[in-house]
Curated annotation (Swiss-Prot):
The keyword ATP-binding applies. It is found in: Cytoplasm. PROSITE patterns: RECA_2. Pfam families: RecA. It comes from the Bacteria. GO terms for biological process: DNA recombination; DNA repair; SOS response. The lineage of its organism: Bacteria, Bacillati, Actinomycetota, Actinomycetes, Kitasatosporales. The keyword tRNA processing does not apply. This is Protein RecA. GO terms for cellular component: cytosol. The gene is recA.
Amino acid sequence: SSGKTTLTLHAVANAPRLGGSVAFIDAEHALDPEYAKKLGVDIDSLILSQPDNGEQALEIVDMLVRSGALDLIVIDSVAALVPRAEIEGEMGDSHVGLQARLMSQALRKITSALNQSKTTAIFINQLREKIGVMFGSPETTT
């Protein structure tokens, strides 16, 4: 609720005006097309993907970057990039570090592709409060 998505939607709205092509990876499945239109986003020219899991989202990002066809890719949000194993697993199963490993591996691959392209990628993340923190900042990313 601090305006991260709104800020990126302004970038998404401006890129086509400058001749750029844009993709929005809506991992949260929460993009409001009407709100985006009010901010100036051309929904008809926007490449929109609502992937089923983290692996699918990151594979789409990698493919789009390697295509060289886009100027901007927004991924909303890192916290919603849930690994396939966690989605398909049983309630209560331990998936310690699974998302961190997925992100680490994918970012190495995507960063390499980004370095060889003209594409900008914006990954949105969320701050959460750590429960029971006595010292230091209680905020953490997920």
